């Protein structure tokens, strides 16, 4: 759930493919060792994919590298950059793989992986039959005989390449500010999908007028223009009544806002990006969009998703159901979520929330920092976890901010933290996508490799140490109890406050009743995040709980929905 900007500054493709794995917040990083860890991880992932492509297609390593580059889109110079890497490093990679060396040995020889004074030798694959040092020395001898070692051995930064500098700057700006990069009128809504555009918050319908944006109350009943971008405007010629007044007045419109981490934003790396037997041109069609959304897919998330699910299940996002309940809520969604977000650092980007107390509709706010307060990459992980006292102070600061920005009549729902022991229990003896071809990399090995590189996103739960996993769950329960206490004892002028458990065990039980297995609810590449199915099942449980216990939170069901569809169709889409 933690993926900082630095991840875009190592060796291109690998980071495109392994961005999820280098998942610790930048504010906590030990500098060079973290950067070296990213470079190592990216190199091992990329060399593994090249090696497996050669094996699957019974081709040479050279052909495998060219095949991989041919799969990539031209957008964002991805294909160009791939061929640049092949030209720079390809000859040496060929020589090393031709010597039957595994990807981790190759990357140590190429010095993408480094062993420091306190950094152990990290390996993903089973150790070679010969001693590790002997294998590494053999690899170095191969490179000494190479005539192509013309590239620098340190300070690699793909963003220094002239044709990638602007792309990197755009992504960096998007991540740091958490507001749309393309937003002419600076109203925090955009007509562009990615780079924090309408994949994250309702699409603007007039990007040259900052008084026009989703979620606002209509201006003069939107007689002349659609000021709130819900697709309802103008006057009914039959009776002279404005459509907004006829269809929406008294229907209690409201928006949905998520304050979340990468789980809420639906962080997702398609496994076919790493699985040689499944790779094709079609596998990477969404790569440019995913990269400019920080490898998140909020348009498919459980809270703010507006596209139909790709998973095939019937459950819908909370926004989707809120819009179905009242079509006047069209486009009123915001995903104020960020990779690495926690109660500690939400204050750094909560200003990106777009809500005006004087001119906007109320909102339902879901506070869902479900992991990073107990998850970190530190070797001594427990002291780095948020304490109940810190959680109380952090959340109260957030709620105070919301009280000064949300319109009266809003609602805030605090999500508890899950018990993440299911991660290890469900995955540790299964094969990671990189290990499925040759049955040589389990999730236990993968987690250990990340931990060695100081990149494990959750040393507490993604650990073979059962005692540590238990301690992490105990702290998560303490923090959930703190949230529950806040919800039951604190009051605010502009919103009421509720608490819901993030009961992942109930989601697992639900899924098993449908014939599924727990591991099918976890993102396969990072082995950490809930996947699309899990997010939608959780959204369904939250919706049902609200509907049963606090139905006023959802507002009325609009009796004019069918008439809105008849007059305005899909209301301009999303």
From Swiss-Prot:
Keywords: Calcium, Cytoplasmic vesicle, Disulfide bond, Glycoprotein, Hydrolase, Lipid metabolism, Metal-binding, Secreted, Signal, Zymogen. It comes from the Eukaryota. GO terms for molecular function: acyloxyacyl hydrolase activity; calcium ion binding. Binds 3 Ca(2+) ions per subunit. The calcium ions probably have a structural role. Its cofactor is Ca(2+). Residues 1-22 form the signal peptide. The record marks 344 as: Interacts with lipopolysaccharide. It is found in: Secreted; Cytoplasmic vesicle. Ca(2+) 1 binds at residues 183, 185, 187, 189, 204, 207. Detected in peritoneal macrophages (at protein level). Strongly expressed in kidney cortex, where it may be produced by proximal tubule cells. In liver, expressed at high levels in Kupffer cells. Expressed by dendritic cells. Detected at low levels in alveolar macrophages. This is Acyloxyacyl hydrolase. Glycans are attached at residues 58, 206, 408, 465. Induction: Strongly up-regulated in alveolar macrophages in response to bacterial lipopolysaccharides (LPS). It is an enzyme of class 3 (hydrolase). The lineage of its organism: Eukaryota, Metazoa, Chordata, Craniata, Vertebrata. GO terms for cellular component: cytoplasmic vesicle; extracellular region. Residues 172-176 are annotated as: Lipopolysaccharide binding. PROSITE patterns: SAP_B. It comes from Mus musculus (Mouse). Pfam families: Lipase_GDSL, Saposin. One of its GO terms (biological process) is lipopolysaccharide metabolic process. PANTHER family: ACYLOXYACYL HYDROLASE. Disruption phenotype: Animals develop significant and prolonged hepatosplenomegaly in response to bacterial lipopolysaccharide (LPS) challenge. Both liver and spleen show increased accumulation of leukocytes. Significantly reduced deacylation of LPS in liver and spleen, in peritoneal macrophages, and in bone marrow-derived dendritic cells. Increased lung injury, delayed neutrophil clearance, and prolonged recovery time in response to intranasal LPS administration. Alveolar macrophages show persistent activation and cytokine levels in lung remain elevated 4-7 days after LPS administration. Residues 36-117 form the Saposin B-type domain. Its main location: secreted. Removes the secondary (acyloxyacyl-linked) fatty acyl chains from the lipid A region of bacterial lipopolysaccharides (LPS). By breaking down LPS, terminates the host response to bacterial infection and prevents prolonged and damaging inflammatory responses. In peritoneal macrophages, seems to be important for recovery from a state of immune tolerance following infection by Gram-negative bacteria. The gene is Aoah.
């Amino acid at each position: 759930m933690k993926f900082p900007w630095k991840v875009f500054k190592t060796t291109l493709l690998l980071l495109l493919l392994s961005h999820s794995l280098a998942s610790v917040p930048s504010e906590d990083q030990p500098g060079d060792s973290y950067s070296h860890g990213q470079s190592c991880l990216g190199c091992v992932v990329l060399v593994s994919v090249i090696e497996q492509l050669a094996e699957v297609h019974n081709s040479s390593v050279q052909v495998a590298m060219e095949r991989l580059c041919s799969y990539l889109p031209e957008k964002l110079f991805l294909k160009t950059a791939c061929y640049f890497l092949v030209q720079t490093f390809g000859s040496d990679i060929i020589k090393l793989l031709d010597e039957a060396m595994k990807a981790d040995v190759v990357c140590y020889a190429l010095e993408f992986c480094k062993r420091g004074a306190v950094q152990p030798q990290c390996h993903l694959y089973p150790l070679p039959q010969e001693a590790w040092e002997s294998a590494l020395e053999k690899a170095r001898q191969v490179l000494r005989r190479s005539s192509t070692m013309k590239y620098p051995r340190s300070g690699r930064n793909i963003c220094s390449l002239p044709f990638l500098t602007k792309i990197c700057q755009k992504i960096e700006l998007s991540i740091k500010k958490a507001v749309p990069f393309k937003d002419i009128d600076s109203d925090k809504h955009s007509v562009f999908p990615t780079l924090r555009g309408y994949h994250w918050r309702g699409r603007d319908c007039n990007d040259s007028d900052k008084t026009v944006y989703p979620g606002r109350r209509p201006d003069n009943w939107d007689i002349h223009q659609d000021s709130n971008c819900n697709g309802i405007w103008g006057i009914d010629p039959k009776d002279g009544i404005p459509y907004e007044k006829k269809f929406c007045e008294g229907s209690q419109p409201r928006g949905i806002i998520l304050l979340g981490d990468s789980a809420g934003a639906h962080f997702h790396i398609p496994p076919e990006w790493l699985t040689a037997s499944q790779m094709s041109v079609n596998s990477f069609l969404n790569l440019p969009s995913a990269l400019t959304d920080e490898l998140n897919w909020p348009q498919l998330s459980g809270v703010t998703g507006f596209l139909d699910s790709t998973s095939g299940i019937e459950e819908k996002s909370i926004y989707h159901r809120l819009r179905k309940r009242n079509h006047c809520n069209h486009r009123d969604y915001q995903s104020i979520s960020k990779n690495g977000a926690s109660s500690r650092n939400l204050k750094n980007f909560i200003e990106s929330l777009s809500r005006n107390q004087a001119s906007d509709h109320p909102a339902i706010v879901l506070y869902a920092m479900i992991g990073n307060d107990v998850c970190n990459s530190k070797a001594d992980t427990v002291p780095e976890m948020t304490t109940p006292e810190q959680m109380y102070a952090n959340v109260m600061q957030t709620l105070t901010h919301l009280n000064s920005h949300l319109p009266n009549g809003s609602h805030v729902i605090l999500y508890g933290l899950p018990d993440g022991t299911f991660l290890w229990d469900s995955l540790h003896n299964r094969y990671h996508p990189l290990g499925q071809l040759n049955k040589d990399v389990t999730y236990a090995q993968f987690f250990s490799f990340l931990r060695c590189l100081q990149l494990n996103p959750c040393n507490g739960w993604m650990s073979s140490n059962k005692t540590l996993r238990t301690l992490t769950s105990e702290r998560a329960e303490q923090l959930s109890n703190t949230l529950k206490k806040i919800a039951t004892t604190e009051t605010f002028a502009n919103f009421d406050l509720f608490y819901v458990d993030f009961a992942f065990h109930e989601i697992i039980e639900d899924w098993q009743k449908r014939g599924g297995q727990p591991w099918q609810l976890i993102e396969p590449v990072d082995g950490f995040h809930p996947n699309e199915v899990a997010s939608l099942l959780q959204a369904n449980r939250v919706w049902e709980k609200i509907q049963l216990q606090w139905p006023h939170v959802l507002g009325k069901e609009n009796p004019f929905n069918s008439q809105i569809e008849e007059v305005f169709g899909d209301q301009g889409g999303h």
